């Protein structure tokens, strides 16, 4: 956002506390500063990740440890998320579902091959047959997915109704809206979806970083999903570059 959000221009601080209580300016003015290099990130990913999206169990566990040690929501964001989640999580068994639409359908290089809505619905039905879930929590950036799920599972589907969702092949991250603090809200909405998915008892989803984060947060709490189905259609290798 061009204006201050929660008193800051730092997008990380829109939602999170700084791990050590220092600001960016504090760090820049310190006598000794160590900066990470992109090459270090490449080495870590080659060692612990199968591809740009799929994590090894060891890598996920290491990230869960880091999350547990360093990552904290700020007071405002934590209160907002807790308040929003209480309407869905009321001691019912909840199956979380993440369906990624919009720009995933465009098939960009190094992005997951899009999961079809029919694939997701089929796996949800299988999970419902094997486990007792009273509710389905649906996290999606696609308007049509909400309509399909409500038709397939009437009275069972819950989702956040204030989420900005798209209809075409363009990422909602590039969307424009008249609502106040639109891009801050986009960040909050995906963060809230992630924490909601982490709070679910089961999970059906395709490959995505939102799902990776939910699994990391889940493990950091010392819990496991009763059922976990990650639909993996592979990664696009076609040279098509991501664009607005």
Residue ranges and their predicted role:
Residues 187:
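Catalytic "initiation/cleavage/transfer" segments centered on a nucleophilic residue
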Residues 98-104, 125-181:
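Catalytic donor nucleotide-activated moiety binding site of glycosyltransferases and closely related
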Residues 190-234:
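A donor-sugar binding/catalytic signature common to diverse glycosyltransferases
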Residues 1, 102, 141-143, 208-209, ...:
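An acidic- and aromatic-residue-enriched active-site/binding cleft used to recognize and process polar
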Residues 113, 179-184:
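Short, flexible loop segments at the rims of nucleotide/cofactor-binding pockets, characterized by
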Residues 1, 96-98, 137-139, 158-159, ...:
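A structural signal for short, well-ordered beta-strand segments and their strand-loop junctions
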Residues 1-126, 130, 134-135, 146:
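Secretory-pathway glycan-assembly enzymes, especially type II membrane glycosyltransferases
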Residues 230-244:
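Leloir-type glycosyltransferase catalytic cores
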């Amino acid at each position: 956002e061009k204006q201050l959000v929660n008193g800051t221009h730092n997008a990380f601080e829109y939602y999170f506390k700084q791990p050590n209580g220092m600001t960016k300016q504090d760090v820049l003015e310190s006598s000794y500063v160590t900066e990470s290099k992109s090459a270090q990130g490449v080495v870590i990913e080659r060692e612990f990740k199968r591809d740009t999206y799929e994590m090894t169990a060891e890598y996920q566990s290491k990230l869960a440890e880091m999350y547990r040690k360093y990552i904290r929501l700020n007071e405002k964001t934590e209160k907002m998320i807790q308040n929003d989640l209480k309407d869905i999580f009321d001691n019912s068994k909840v199956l979380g579902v993440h369906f990624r639409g919009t720009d995933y359908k465009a098939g960009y290089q190094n992005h997951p091959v899009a999961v079809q809505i029919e694939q997701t619905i089929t796996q949800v039905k299988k999970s419902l047959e094997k486990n007792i879930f009273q509710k389905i929590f649906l996290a999606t950036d696609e308007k049509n997915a909400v309509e399909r799920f409500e038709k397939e599972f009437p009275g069972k589907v819950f989702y956040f109704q204030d989420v900005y969702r798209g209809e075409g092949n363009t990422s909602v991250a590039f969307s424009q809206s008249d609502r106040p603090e639109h891009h801050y809200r986009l960040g909050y909405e995906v963060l809230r979806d992630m924490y909601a998915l982490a709070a679910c008892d089961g999970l059906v989803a395709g490959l995505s970083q939102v799902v990776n984060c939910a699994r990391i947060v889940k493990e950091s709490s010392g819990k496991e999903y009763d059922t976990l189905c990650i639909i993996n259609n592979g990664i696009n290798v076609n040279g098509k570059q991501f664009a607005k």
